[in-house]
Protein backbone atom coordinates (compact mmCIF):
# COMPACT_ATOMS: atom_id res chain seq x y z
CA UNK A 1 0.00 0.00 0.00
CA UNK A 2 2.78 2.45 0.89
CA UNK A 3 4.31 2.00 -2.58
CA UNK A 4 1.01 3.12 -4.16
CA UNK A 5 0.96 6.12 -1.84
CA UNK A 6 4.55 7.00 -2.80
CA UNK A 7 3.67 6.77 -6.50
CA UNK A 8 0.72 9.12 -5.93
CA UNK A 9 2.91 11.46 -3.87
CA UNK A 10 5.66 11.70 -6.50
CA UNK A 11 3.06 12.50 -9.18
CA UNK A 12 1.15 15.02 -7.00
CA UNK A 13 3.69 16.91 -4.89
CA UNK A 14 4.61 20.11 -6.79
CA UNK A 15 8.35 19.75 -6.17
CA UNK A 16 8.58 16.15 -7.33
CA UNK A 17 5.92 16.35 -10.06
CA UNK A 18 7.83 19.20 -11.71
CA UNK A 19 10.92 16.98 -12.02
CA UNK A 20 9.36 13.66 -13.03
CA UNK A 21 8.08 12.46 -16.40
CA UNK A 22 6.73 9.04 -15.43
CA UNK A 23 6.47 6.86 -12.30
CA UNK A 24 5.95 3.10 -12.17
CA UNK A 25 5.57 0.54 -9.43
CA UNK A 26 8.30 -2.06 -10.01
CA UNK A 27 5.84 -4.63 -11.39
CA UNK A 28 4.56 -2.00 -13.91
CA UNK A 29 8.02 -0.87 -15.05
CA UNK A 30 8.45 -1.91 -18.72
CA UNK A 31 12.25 -2.32 -18.43
CA UNK A 32 12.33 -4.30 -15.16
CA UNK A 33 14.89 -7.10 -15.10
CA UNK A 34 13.31 -9.49 -12.63
CA UNK A 35 11.20 -9.84 -9.51
CA UNK A 36 11.03 -7.15 -6.82
CA UNK A 37 14.37 -7.55 -5.04
CA UNK A 38 14.49 -4.18 -3.32
CA UNK A 39 13.39 -1.60 -5.87
CA UNK A 40 9.77 -0.62 -5.20
CA UNK A 41 9.28 2.06 -7.85
CA UNK A 42 11.10 3.59 -10.80
CA UNK A 43 10.72 7.06 -12.27
CA UNK A 44 12.19 8.91 -15.20
CA UNK A 45 13.41 12.40 -14.46
CA UNK A 46 12.69 15.22 -16.90
CA UNK A 47 16.41 15.13 -17.75
CA UNK A 48 15.97 11.55 -19.03
CA UNK A 49 17.72 9.84 -16.11
CA UNK A 50 16.19 6.77 -14.48
CA UNK A 51 15.77 6.63 -10.70
CA UNK A 52 15.12 3.66 -8.43
CA UNK A 53 12.94 4.20 -5.37
CA UNK A 54 12.82 2.25 -2.11
CA UNK A 55 9.76 3.06 -0.01
CA UNK A 56 9.89 2.17 3.67
CA UNK A 57 6.68 2.30 5.69
CA UNK A 58 7.82 1.94 9.27
CA UNK A 59 6.83 3.47 12.58
CA UNK A 60 8.03 7.06 13.02
CA UNK A 61 9.60 5.85 16.29
CA UNK A 62 11.87 3.34 14.52
CA UNK A 63 15.07 3.79 12.54
CA UNK A 64 15.73 2.28 9.13
CA UNK A 65 18.19 -0.58 9.59
CA UNK A 66 21.04 -1.45 7.23
CA UNK A 67 19.49 -4.88 6.56
CA UNK A 68 16.32 -3.14 5.34
CA UNK A 69 18.12 -1.26 2.55
CA UNK A 70 20.89 -3.69 1.54
CA UNK A 71 18.95 -5.30 -1.32
CA UNK A 72 17.82 -1.88 -2.61
CA UNK A 73 21.39 -0.58 -2.66
CA UNK A 74 22.56 -3.73 -4.41
CA UNK A 75 19.81 -3.79 -7.07
CA UNK A 76 19.93 -0.06 -7.73
CA UNK A 77 23.68 -0.10 -8.33
CA UNK A 78 22.85 -1.49 -11.79
CA UNK A 79 24.10 0.64 -14.70
CA UNK A 80 20.50 1.12 -15.91
CA UNK A 81 19.82 3.24 -12.80
CA UNK A 82 21.14 6.81 -12.62
CA UNK A 83 19.76 7.98 -9.27
CA UNK A 84 18.36 6.52 -6.06
CA UNK A 85 15.65 7.72 -3.71
CA UNK A 86 14.96 6.29 -0.27
CA UNK A 87 11.56 7.54 0.87
CA UNK A 88 10.33 6.63 4.35
CA UNK A 89 7.67 7.27 6.97
CA UNK A 90 10.28 7.89 9.66
CA UNK A 91 13.04 10.43 10.20
CA UNK A 92 15.36 7.85 11.71
CA UNK A 93 18.16 6.15 9.82
CA UNK A 94 20.28 3.78 11.88
CA UNK A 95 24.01 4.43 12.25
CA UNK A 96 25.09 1.45 10.10
CA UNK A 97 22.48 2.23 7.43
CA UNK A 98 23.64 5.86 7.29
CA UNK A 99 27.29 4.80 6.97
CA UNK A 100 26.45 2.52 4.03
CA UNK A 101 24.37 5.25 2.37
CA UNK A 102 27.21 7.75 2.78
CA UNK A 103 29.74 5.36 1.21
CA UNK A 104 27.77 4.77 -1.98
CA UNK A 105 29.37 5.89 -5.24
CA UNK A 106 25.91 6.51 -6.66
CA UNK A 107 24.17 9.05 -4.42
CA UNK A 108 21.11 8.07 -2.38
CA UNK A 109 18.63 10.91 -1.83
CA UNK A 110 16.69 10.44 1.43
CA UNK A 111 13.16 11.82 1.69
CA UNK A 112 11.87 11.29 5.20
CA UNK A 113 8.84 11.99 7.39
CA UNK A 114 9.72 15.64 8.04
CA UNK A 115 9.79 16.34 4.28
CA UNK A 116 6.32 14.75 3.98
CA UNK A 117 5.14 17.13 6.69
CA UNK A 118 6.54 20.11 4.78
CA UNK A 119 4.89 19.10 1.52
CA UNK A 120 2.39 21.43 -0.13
CA UNK A 121 -0.15 18.61 -0.41
CA UNK A 122 -3.29 18.00 1.60
CA UNK A 123 -3.02 14.29 2.23
CA UNK A 124 -6.13 12.14 1.72
CA UNK A 125 -7.63 10.41 4.74
CA UNK A 126 -7.42 6.93 3.19
CA UNK A 127 -5.84 5.06 0.29
CA UNK A 128 -9.23 5.01 -1.47
CA UNK A 129 -9.19 8.82 -1.48
CA UNK A 130 -5.78 9.22 -3.16
CA UNK A 131 -7.34 10.68 -6.29
CA UNK A 132 -8.91 13.44 -4.20
CA UNK A 133 -5.67 14.63 -2.58
CA UNK A 134 -4.84 18.18 -3.56
CA UNK A 135 -2.26 20.87 -3.05
CA UNK A 136 -2.57 23.05 0.01
CA UNK A 137 -3.81 26.54 -0.59
CA UNK A 138 -0.88 28.94 -0.84
CA UNK A 139 -0.56 31.26 2.12
CA UNK A 140 -1.12 34.95 1.51
CA UNK A 141 0.41 37.74 3.58
CA UNK A 142 -1.78 39.34 6.23
CA UNK A 143 -2.10 43.14 6.41
CA UNK A 144 0.66 43.56 9.02
CA UNK A 145 2.94 41.31 6.95
CA UNK A 146 2.23 43.30 3.78
CA UNK A 147 3.21 46.46 5.66
CA UNK A 148 6.47 44.82 6.83
CA UNK A 149 7.25 43.55 3.31
CA UNK A 150 6.74 47.03 1.83
CA UNK A 151 8.90 48.72 4.47
CA UNK A 152 11.72 46.18 4.15
CA UNK A 153 11.60 46.34 0.34
CA UNK A 154 11.89 50.12 0.54
CA UNK A 155 14.71 49.93 3.11
CA UNK A 156 16.89 47.51 1.16
CA UNK A 157 16.89 49.85 -1.82
CA UNK A 158 19.31 52.06 0.10
CA UNK A 159 21.01 49.49 2.36
CA UNK A 160 22.55 46.09 1.71
CA UNK A 161 20.93 44.51 4.78
CA UNK A 162 18.32 45.16 7.40
CA UNK A 163 16.39 43.78 10.31
CA UNK A 164 12.73 42.87 10.76
CA UNK A 165 11.35 43.33 14.26
CA UNK A 166 7.93 41.78 14.78
CA UNK A 167 6.21 40.28 17.81
CA UNK A 168 6.34 36.53 18.47
CA UNK A 169 3.82 34.55 16.45
CA UNK A 170 3.21 37.21 13.81
CA UNK A 171 4.88 35.29 10.98
CA UNK A 172 8.39 36.69 10.67
CA UNK A 173 9.76 33.62 8.89
CA UNK A 174 6.90 33.49 6.42
CA UNK A 175 7.14 37.25 5.87
CA UNK A 176 10.84 36.92 5.06
CA UNK A 177 10.01 34.44 2.29
CA UNK A 178 7.83 37.04 0.54
CA UNK A 179 10.52 39.73 0.54
CA UNK A 180 12.12 40.02 -2.88
Protein language model regions, located:
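Nuclease catalytic cores
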Residues: 1-7
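Helical mechanochemical/support elements of P-loop NTPase systems and associated helical scaffolds
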Residues: 2, 65-68
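ATP-dependent helicase/translocase motor core
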Residues: 9, 15-18, 24, 31-32, ...
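Active-site metal-binding core of divalent-cation-utilizing nuclease and nuclease-like domains
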Residues: 21-47
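Glycine-rich, highly charged phosphate/nucleotide-binding loops
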Residues: 36-37, 68-70
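Acidic active-site catalytic centers that drive phospho-/nucleotidyl reactions
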Residues: 40, 54, 145, 172
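Active-site beta-strand-loop-beta-strand hairpin of nuclease catalytic cores
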Residues: 42-53, 79
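Short beta-strand-loop-alpha-helix junction that forms the active-site gateway
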Residues: 47, 55-66
Amino acid sequence: QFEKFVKWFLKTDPTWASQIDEVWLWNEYPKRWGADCGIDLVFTHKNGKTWAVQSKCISPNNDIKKSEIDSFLSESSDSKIDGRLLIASTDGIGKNAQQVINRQEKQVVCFLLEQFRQSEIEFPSSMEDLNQGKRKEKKKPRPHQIEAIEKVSEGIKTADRGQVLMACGTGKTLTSLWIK
